[in-house]
């Protein structure tokens, strides 16, 4: 009996000590409490040195550090070395000569003697550096035009003569009575006209400078030369006249309020006409690519059938965006990736530069929206795409099986091959220098892991290299023998390691970033559990459970932000303050569940698109199913469950409190979207289509339409200079509550904070209010 009593006392005091050891004022310091973690890791060109950004001494910001094998600890790099390490270099394979742009000027760097040489300097900066097929030839962009620079000869040639506006050619004069009369009466006038025609026809001094091409009011972008420099492709984009949202700043240096443009709201008015053009250098001519023969380019989305106004629409081509071509080594193949602006289609085509015609290689369609790892999620973005060593086979990713996997397509034989398969995703693709081996980041062993595999193109067999639980962010050394690894686990923050590039490698730690204060606490490794949703779909979640003797039968459900994000994983969370807050809540006796609901990242296409046309549908029911799981398995009182989250998590909190008012006793909604018609175009248009074409999707997905249902205790918290989800969102919902006579709500405003809070005092105030809400509404019932 004495032993049992002694054990109870030890557990009691151990629990009390741990609960007292976490304080909001400390954990809300974020990385100042945890330790500032290394990031932006990179190799030197010769592979001898590792560079990364770090702040171990709590300075005002990150500085560049370096490390080499044999060093006991990383050292701070000089300012010049730090700057040089961040430059983007391009190399002609095997030449040992690298080219780069620094402050708008062109340089070369010889790996042999480690010396830089300035090649071109001009008052107008250069950009868009490309390597040509010929040795020593590079291309760059200056203003709107492309130039060819031969570093061996020192010659500079302007390839294009693109000009904004209309042609400067003299407008043809209208014939008039007086003009005709002058020619009729005076020989002098007739002679001058004939002389002008003769001079024009016999101008021996004709320039070989490219003729001007005027692109009007459009913008010109994605300008790119073919490897031989015989063609230049470009994209014209119509300038859309759309209204920008404005945000007011209240706390300013001079005491006067200021206004700032933030974003354009989702709308079909944001659709723009784009055209892909080709400039033929030898023929000095421009022609446009006609994509009207793309398969399914006139198909309308299925949801159109739900609206009477859409049933008899005239057929027309979808608006699309074509990316700059990806070339093989000699430029004999040019592959163009295309995405529709209605978000439903993606094409890959083989473009014939000489004729402007093309052959369609791949068409991908998703009735929700095109996306997933390695696949463009927005009209103006691009996905995984490149050539293998044979110069006739491309590789790309597709979600056709339900998970994003790697494929090849041979342009000569028209043979398509799936290289990877299974209920997991290819998260990242790196091709070796000889273009015969892939290095893949996947989540093969668990959706919440990030592993590193080697795969030879010839056999497509995955060879595991780094497969422990957690996340491995890997940078391959220039000689491909060593791995620079940024690794973390659920309760172990990101650190840098190195490993040999072979099976069974162990990680050798380079950085030690966490503070003594952080290390004093025994941080939980939350269990990643799976429960069944009401429709049978397995749903992953992080579970934090208190000691039995301390459990208070109350629970808090955390809803991560972004929607398409993963948080029930096996590595360190971007929500590190929330992770520490969940430890604090668990110390206080709460059970905490952090759910990867429908719409989350890491689980394939069906989960990714599970929120299509109804945000606040399955993503919310997953929270309720998670609550029921806790009630059935962990002794949680169904009347003592709270919910909170930020951004998308704040939106779900609002939908929970307003559309299922009996489910949650309290909710804290941070930086919440309250009306999706007021959010940005790219993100919202993917999921809900557009307010003009699919208004029903917006109405059933927006909390502001359900304000009358509020019953539980709602706390809203929002930064007043949020340029992502504007403060106006929560102001509009507040006005609805006021007009409807609702009482059980409050709003906390943070005058200097944006979407992601910066100041510790703001974090402390915000989470202090959240903790008070849960303690006052979920306990002592």
Protein language model features and the residues they cover:
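Serine-hydrolase catalytic core recognition
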Residues: 471-781
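Compositionally biased, intrinsically disordered low-complexity segments enriched
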Residues: 8, 160, 184, 362-365, ...
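Beta-propeller folds
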Residues: 19-462, 469-470, 481-482, 490-494, ...
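Bacterial Sec-dependent N-terminal signal peptides
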Residues: 1-23
